[in-house]
Amino acid sequence: MAEESVPSGSLLSLDPELQKDFQQKVHEIRRKSQVGAVSPGVIYIGHIPRALYEPQLREYFSQFGTVTRLRLSRSKKTGNSKGYAYVEFECDEVAKIVADTMNNYLFCERLLKCEFVPPEKVHPRLFIGCTAKFRKPTKPAVSRYNKRRSEAEQKKMTQRMLSKENKVRKRLAEKGIDYDFPGFAARRERKEPTCDADTSVSSQDPTPVCTPTVLERRKSVRLEQNDEDDDDGEVVLKLPQEDEEVVLKLPLKVTPTAKRQKISKSEKKTKIKKQK
């Protein structure tokens, strides 16, 4: 079979067997566009390879017709492609042909998914900002963390964090999971009452209280602290009888060991001779 001659400048179908039908449809679309105004058409493209971005997609789909607008979905945090995009053609008939032709087309080891989106389902804000040049965010998490927030923004942020925490706690309670974790809300520490709070003063160690009632109760109580040395500087307390006064006997000179001056050997010998 002789190969059919294809005029230069005409579009080529992906399937050579359907080249005639494809050219007829394109010819009809171009004739209609010359006669009257045409309505634009939008297609959805899924399973896009990672290597394709806005310039590559626009260049590839421009072979079917005039591409007026293109929107590739990207991540706000990283700026990478999410794998799907929306392309608007000047004519809706061209968009339908592209959706039928490129659906389930193997491209870079991926099957492209193309669907025609009806005009009533196209969101009015779908292509906002599509003409601006994309700039990949640099350290978005750091800039977001170091951002100076106003009082209203801080209040809104704390309310959002507390609401998320309450939702997590409710979800755990609904599933019957008894699990507690420290949250964002500040909690006051509760002071637990001691077990000796209800005990009387008489059960505690004796103190030198000079009231007649206490002295009468503690006539037979005596506190003595046995020390290895008598000159250690410790207080020896003895509770008196009825008519005696409380006297605290302290040593005349109490000097801490750390502050004592060092005595030389010669001074020690002179002191010993004087004592003799």
UniProtKB/Swiss-Prot annotation:
The keyword DNA-binding does not apply. The lineage of its organism: Eukaryota, Metazoa, Chordata, Craniata, Vertebrata. It holds the Pfam family hNIFK_binding. It is found in: Nucleus, Nucleolus. Residues 197-206 have a biased composition (Polar residues). This is MKI67 FHA domain-interacting nucleolar phosphoprotein-like. The keyword Nucleus applies. GO terms for molecular function: RNA binding. Keywords: Nucleus, RNA-binding. InterPro entries: NIFK_FHA_Ki67-binding (IPR021043), Nucleotide-bd_a/b_plait_sf (IPR012677), RBD_domain_sf (IPR035979), RRM_dom (IPR000504). It comes from Xenopus tropicalis. GO terms for cellular component: nucleolus. Coiled coil: none annotated. Residues 190-211, 256-276 are annotated as: Disordered. Residues 41-119 form the RRM domain.
